[in-house]
């Protein structure tokens, strides 16, 4: 097949996206496909239409963060009739917005830590938040990934610094109760829950950007140290979160598990990283899958879905851009 890989983009996760894109490009080429990489810009709709006219069969999205993981590109590809891997526009948009996700989790009975919204019309103080959520607490921008803009705060000074950091990347911020315990992540491929991974940062208890992407920044424990009953609760909560948002293909659910082994869903990532230090490839490896085999399964899953729905197959679409050259 002729495959276009979208990598780079303009979000704060651009560099991670490039690493993901290069790894997926190699895997797709190893599978015998002809692969072209495009770095999205404002001309992306026209470029994709041109690629479709030139015989593009599939688009592999290797973007992370706003502009790639939030449903914008997915909606564009649906309109053009080009199949792609992963979740559709709605699930992508819901998962990208952590506040909306948490509201859906709460409505669906999925345990998620308590939170409060901070904005200019509701400028909560440290005392307000600590009284409601306890200390420490977590400050998060609503719509960024890779822990960009996230901080754990323990006093008024770090609270002010955390707000400044979060506001530098997003206008929508919330404060979340910190759950002590273990960091667990679940990779889910079309409803199949892969082996859970317990994340142990090399320094401290915070799985930040450096811990995620720097070699040696964290240790991935497979199998995790949860009891069978605790693991079952964790898997059930993760799968329910995946389904509540309407996810498809590969997604990763991040959770905290408290000392009583109660799971608390933090967020769902619909385009999880596929770098040498990423979690999903490690979970797949625990099943004996190579990186290339994981990519092949994701590709076949997407193609099967496109054939079943007819909504993401280039031959079935009459989408045009008027008289575009």
From Swiss-Prot:
Annotated metabolic or biological route of this protein: Cell wall biogenesis; peptidoglycan biosynthesis
Record-level GO cellular component terms: cytoplasm
InterPro entries: ATP-grasp (IPR011761), ATP_grasp_subdomain_1 (IPR013815), D-Ala_lig_Van_CS (IPR000291), D_ala_D_ala (IPR005905), Dala_Dala_lig_C (IPR011095), Dala_Dala_lig_N (IPR011127), PreATP-grasp_dom_sf (IPR016185)
A Gene Ontology biological process term: peptidoglycan biosynthetic process
Start and end residues of each ATP-grasp domain: 102-300
Positions of Mg(2+) 1 binding: 254, 267
Cofactor note (record): Binds 2 magnesium or manganese ions per subunit.
List of residues binding ATP: 130-185
Keywords for this protein: ATP-binding, Cell shape, Cell wall biogenesis/degradation, Cytoplasm, Ligase, Magnesium, Manganese, Metal-binding, Nucleotide-binding, Peptidoglycan synthesis
GO MF: ATP binding; D-alanine-D-alanine ligase activity; metal ion binding
Enzyme Commission number(s): 6.3.2.4
Function: Cell wall formation.
Family statement drawn from the similarity comment of this UniProt entry: Belongs to the D-alanine--D-alanine ligase family.
PANTHER family: D-ALANINE--D-ALANINE LIGASE, D-ALANINE--D-ALANINE LIGASE B
Name of the featured protein: D-alanine--D-alanine ligase
Source species of the chain: Synechococcus sp. (strain JA-2-3B'a(2-13)) (Cyanobacteria bacterium Yellowstone B-Prime)
Upper taxonomic lineage: Bacteria, Bacillati, Cyanobacteriota, Cyanophyceae, Synechococcales
Gene giving rise to this polypeptide: ddl
């Amino acid at each position: 097949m002729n495959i276009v890989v979208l990598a780079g983009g303009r979000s704060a996760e651009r560099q991670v996206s490039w690493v993901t894109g290069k790894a997926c490009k190699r895997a797709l080429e190893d599978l015998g496909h002809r692969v072209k990489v495009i770095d999205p810009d404002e001309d992306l709709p026209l470029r994709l239409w041109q690629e479709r006219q030139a015989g593009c069969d599939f688009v592999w999205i290797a973007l992370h963060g706003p502009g790639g993981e939030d449903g914008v590109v997915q909606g564009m590809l649906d309109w053009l009739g080009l199949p792609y891997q992963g979740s559709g526009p709605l699930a992508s948009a819901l998962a990208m917005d952590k506040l909306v996700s948490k509201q859906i989790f709460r409505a669906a009975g999925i345990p998620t830590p308590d939170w409060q919204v901070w904005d200019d019309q509701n400028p909560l103080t440290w005392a307000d938040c600590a009284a409601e959520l306890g200390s420490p607490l977590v400050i998060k921008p609503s719509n960024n990934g890779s822990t960009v803009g996230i901080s754990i705060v323990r006093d008024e000074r770090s609270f002010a610094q955390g707000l400044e950091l979060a506001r530098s990347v997003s206008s929508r911020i919330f404060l979340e109760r910190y759950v002590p315990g273990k960091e667990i992540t679940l990779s889910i491929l079309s409803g199949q829950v892969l082996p859970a991974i317990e994340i142990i940062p090399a320094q401290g208890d915070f799985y930040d950007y450096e811990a995620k992407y720097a070699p040696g920044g964290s240790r991935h424990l497979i199998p995790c140290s949860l009891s069978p009953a605790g693991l079952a609760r964790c898997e059930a909560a993760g799968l329910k979160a995946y389904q509540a948002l309407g996810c498809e293909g590969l997604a990763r659910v991040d959770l905290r598990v408290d000392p009583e082994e109660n799971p608390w869903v933090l967020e769902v990532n619909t385009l999880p990283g596929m770098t040498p230090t990423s979690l999903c490839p490690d979970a797949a490896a625990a099943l004996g899958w190579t990186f290339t085999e994981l990519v092949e399964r994701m590709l076949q899953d997407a193609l099967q879905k496109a054939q079943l729905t007819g909504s993401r197959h280039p031959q079935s679409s009459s989408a045009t851009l008027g008289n575009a050259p």
